[in-house]
């Protein structure tokens, strides 16, 4: 992974969003900004990012939810990065 993306988040909610909303979730560097997250995801995974939402978790980690364009399939990207 890059210095911004720590690891993909694999939870039941993340899997539902991947299946039904074409979204992926990552734990990212706490100081990463949304444009930086967008650029890294687009360059590393060769996809088009439509939207990025971030949250700070109770464990003091930053969670980024990345919505992919309709042309890109979140399940294909997840299988390429080893989520399955």
Curated annotation (Swiss-Prot):
Instruction: Specify whether rRNA-binding is a keyword of the entry.
Output: yes
Q: Which Pfam families match?
A: Ribosomal_L23 (PF00276)
Q: Which domain of life is it from?
A: Archaea
Question: What's any one GO cellular component for it?
Answer: ribosome
One GO term of the biological process aspect: translation
The protein's GO terms of the molecular function aspect are: rRNA binding; structural constituent of ribosome
Which keywords does the record carry? Ribonucleoprotein, Ribosomal protein, RNA-binding, rRNA-binding
Recorded hits in InterPro entries, A to Z, give: Nucleotide-bd_a/b_plait_sf, Ribosomal_uL23, Ribosomal_uL23-like, Ribosomal_uL23/eL15/eS24_sf, Ribosomal_uL23_CS
User: Which HAMAP family does this UniProt record tie to the protein?
Assistant: Ribosomal_uL23_A
As for family, the record states: Belongs to the universal ribosomal protein uL23 family.
Q: What does this protein do?
A: Binds to 23S rRNA. One of the proteins that surrounds the polypeptide exit tunnel on the outside of the ribosome.
Subunit structure and binding partners:
Part of the 50S ribosomal subunit. Contacts protein L29.
PANTHER family registered for this protein in UniProt = 60S RIBOSOMAL PROTEIN L23A
The name this protein carries in UniProt is: Large ribosomal subunit protein uL23
